[in-house]
């Protein structure tokens, strides 16, 4: 494990196990480790209990599959490939097929771009290959069903968005849809038609993935607010979204979760 400069961290034994380590310092004259105070049993218990409580809440209101989707999506949004490796394993062990995990990563490119989506897919490929080399053959699963609707893609996407958001398809356009009409067309045709019509994930699962991806991206509170509202319209409960943010906080940190928790609380108060 390599620790970046100026990162305060602890290491040592847990309450029920011992731990030994060798610290290697480069350039010890100018880069010497600064040893701080020991961590007391009370401090250790407080920190670990907080994490356990967050996951306990998630376990109460989110299935293991939903928790896996949240973790995969948020790490992908952030571009944290190192933590994605273990997260992919947990997703597969939670019963997700290879194609279903891939679908989360494919969905992600609409919200965090092709580079992070593709890097996550490449990382997932290596995880699957390593597991196969170790005699673990993960279930590939079915492909997405063929889309038989030959209707206008813009209108199909418009109708999907109206269904999941509860906002009339005939609502007047505003904001970016007027300023850059082509992006609004791409959103309807590609995101809400081409992607949302793929049936490897439900609408609910896609929206859980979406808000998690946005959490990982950071700094996109207005988009998070819109999609959190869609989640609520689809029947996802406030406590489920709160548990989602607990997972984000545990995995990515409070700087990723807290701005969104403020937005979520404001949204819930208006309901």
Q: What role is predicted for each listed range?
A:
Residues 1-6:
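Short acidic-glycine-tyrosine-enriched beta hairpin
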Residues 9-11, 21, 87, 107, ...:
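Histidine-centered active-site/metal-ligand motif
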Residues 10-51:
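Double-stranded beta-helix
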Residues 51-66, 75-94, 100, 116-203, ...:
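Acidic, glycine/proline-rich low-complexity segments that act as flexible tails and inter-domain linkers
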Residues 67-78, 205-220:
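Amphipathic, charged-and-aliphatic alpha-helical interface segments
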Residues 220-229, 242:
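Short conserved catalytic/interaction loops centered on acidic-Pro-aromatic/His motifs
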């Amino acid at each position: 494990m390599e620790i970046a400069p100026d990162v305060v961290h602890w290491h040592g034994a847990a309450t029920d196990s011992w731990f030994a380590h060798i610290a290697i310092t480069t350039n010890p004259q100018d880069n010497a480790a600064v040893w701080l105070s020991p961590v007391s049993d009370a401090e250790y218990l407080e920190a670990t209990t907080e994490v356990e409580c967050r996951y306990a809440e998630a376990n109460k209101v989110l299935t293991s599959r939903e928790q896996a989707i949240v973790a995969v999506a948020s790490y992908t949004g952030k571009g944290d490939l190192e933590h994605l490796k273990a997260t992919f394993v947990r997703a597969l062990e939670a019963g997700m097929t290879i194609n279903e995990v891939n679908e989360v990563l494919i969905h992600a490119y609409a919200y965090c771009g092709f580079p992070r989506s593709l890097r996550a897919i490449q990382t997932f490929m290596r995880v699957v290959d390593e597991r196969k080399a170790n005699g673990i053959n993960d279930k590939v699963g079915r492909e997405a069903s063929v889309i038989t609707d030959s209707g206008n893609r813009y209108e199909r996407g418009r109708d999907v968005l109206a269904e999941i958001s509860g906002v009339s398809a005939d609502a007047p356009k505003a904001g970016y849809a007027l300023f850059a009409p082509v992006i609004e067309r791409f959103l309807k045709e590609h995101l809400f038609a081409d992607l949302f019509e793929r049936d490897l994930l439900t609408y609910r699962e896609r929206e859980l993935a979406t808000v998690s991806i946005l959490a990982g991206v950071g700094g996109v509170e207005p988009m998070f607010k819109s999609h959190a509202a869609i989640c609520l319209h689809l029947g996802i409960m406030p406590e489920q979204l709160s548990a989602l943010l607990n997972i984000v906080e545990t995995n990515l940190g409070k700087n990723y979760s807290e701005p969104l928790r403020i937005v979520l609380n404001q949204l819930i108060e208006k309901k």
